[in-house]
Amino acid sequence: MSSKQQLACTYAALILADSGKTDMDSLLKVTKAAGVDVSKGMASAFASILKNVDINDVLSKVSFGGVAPAAGGATAAPAAAAAAAAPAAAAAKKEEEEEDDDMGFGLFD
């Protein structure tokens, strides 16, 4: 039951993050509206933890394991990907054409 309450409080905190109001009453209202029975103690614990935490700031600092691209690289990435894909597609087509041609070097000719 406790993990269900923790998960409900976590989701409620994420929902309330934009309003900046993650107090006990707000957490209880959101969890009650979701149909989850959360104890006042659990909501109070989450509220006290989140009192001095900016959830949006925490979420913006989450790393997914990759290296972040440079700021200027974000706009050039789609164009670069398209440019890289074009020669690869042409090379694949050329290889396909070469495979179809009989060069006379077959093993069973």
From Swiss-Prot:
Residues 90-109 are annotated as: Disordered. Keywords: Phosphoprotein, Ribonucleoprotein, Ribosomal protein. The keyword Plastid does not apply. It comes from the Eukaryota. One of its GO terms (biological process) is cytoplasmic translation. InterPro entries: P1/P2_N_sf, Ribosomal_P1/P2, Ribosomal_P1/P2_euk. P1 and P2 exist as dimers at the large ribosomal subunit. This is Large ribosomal subunit protein P1.
